[in-house]
Amino acid sequence: MGKPVDDLLNSLMNLLDSETPSGGGCHLCDGLLSRELGKMLRKALSELEGVELSSVKSGVSLPAILIEREDRIRANHNPPKMRSLKVTLTRLLDVAISSLTGLKVSQEPDAILIFDFERGDVKLELAPVFIFGRYRKLQRGISQSRRKCPECGGRGCEACGWKGKIPQGSVEGIVGEVMREFFSAEDYVLHGAGREDVDARMLGEGRPFVMELLSPKRRSADLREVESEINRRAAGLIEVKNLEFSRREKIRILKERSPNVKKLYRALVEVEGGVEEGELELLKGLEGAVIRQRTPKRVLWRRADITRLKRVYEVNFRRIDDKKFELFVLCDGGLYVKELISGDDGRTSPSVTEILGKKSFCSELDVLEVMVE
């Protein structure tokens, strides 16, 4: 790349010189560009080595003194056709990088090259890759998000690879680690359409999610192969399906729709003092009911203490023995079903406990369907 860079550099400098008044070079930058531009172009090409891209954009950071000098020239002389040095330089660098690499210039690029002329450095910022899909959680005890590293409390240490989080035991970590390898990404973030409790399974067609892969050096992969590898490594724990490339906009759509989706739950309910088949028929009174639910005590540490109104659409049940029955509930997303059963000491009403007149609690919970349009 030595000679192509030199040839292009000469062309760029000639172009800049052609816009400089004759007799002594550039009074604006004092020769900064001629001294630094070649070195920084080579650094940019070095940053791009081994990175899979189809588009790029340049960004420029100039020393404050150059900006001040440019402002004084404008104020004192008001040149009619004077273009901003930053804008001009950005356009020239876009052309240069595109010519040297064959990458197209885009306003929504795969990467941005930041040319810092104050420090004489170039930084490559890689746009995330977004992958949409659904996950099924087949075992209890798996969280959706990674947990803080117990060694450092989230600050980052050698034990957690300086991430502050541990991948083991979470959907985000199990799925994200495989995707990170395929895309040579630095890190990842899972964005889900809501979340289930750690001790709940996510069954049926699965929960929609978007995985955001940060600073990926690869941008393409066979997603069927990615899917297969995730399911192989996580056999019996989780499954993913229907993986497809997506965009950041999908995250916003998931988050906006999540509180409004309907969800179907299966709960194993235990009743103090036992329950008869006829008593269970009373639970049909929940169908169509609007539930007044104050934030459950168990999540007050992370949720505002407010009252939410959620609707139950359908209720079915199956008696197992004198003290247990299965409860199937179709309801609004965001309804805490464990508290719909227990009543949470009156914070949720009506509840199974209230209707039966007997203390009831949920010993198992499964999400059977997340009905996202």
Curated annotation (Swiss-Prot):
Keywords: Isomerase, RNA-binding, tRNA processing
Family annotation (InterPro entries): PsdUridine_synth_cat_dom_sf, Pus10, Pus10-like, Pus10-like_C
Function: Responsible for synthesis of pseudouridine from uracil-54 and uracil-55 in the psi GC loop of transfer RNAs.
GO molecular function ontology, one term from the record: tRNA binding
Binding locations of substrate: 265, 336
Pfam families, per database record: Pus10_C
Active-site residues, Swiss-Prot/TrEMBL: 197
Lineage: Archaea, Thermoproteota, Candidatus Korarchaeia, Candidatus Korarchaeales, Candidatus Korarchaeaceae
Gene: pus10
Entry protein name: tRNA pseudouridine synthase Pus10
Enzymatic reactions: uridine(54) in tRNA = pseudouridine(54) in tRNA; uridine(55) in tRNA = pseudouridine(55) in tRNA
